[in-house]
Amino acid sequence: MSNIQNDFIAGIGNTPLIKLRAASEITGCNIYGKAEFLNPGGSVKDRAALALIKDAQEKKLISKGGTVVEGTAGNTGIGLGLLGNSLGYKTIIVMNDNQTQEKKDLLRNLGAELRLVTPKPYKDD
């Protein structure tokens, strides 16, 4: 088994390419899709979350026990919640209160603290 990772973080971004047979046949080219849904948090946003955490660590902006705060509609928050909890950070996610209950529950189950806000209309003057 050569595709065994030491931890789930090593799996972020290391998702397989899948040949799209019908598209390949129609075009006469080999066309592949990157299966980003196989990232640990279920989306490409895991990559962004990992990059944000790594950058903050490298710049010494965060250390174990520190807090990560993100305003998000969900997927970046899921990635940050997953990483934050596993790396020893407190994660606070600020999101609209009209997001699905499933998304809110998932974020809480990942160890994130939610701060729900009511969306307001925006007018650019």
Name the predicted role of every residue range.
Residues M1-D125:
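PLP-dependent amino-acid enzyme catalytic core
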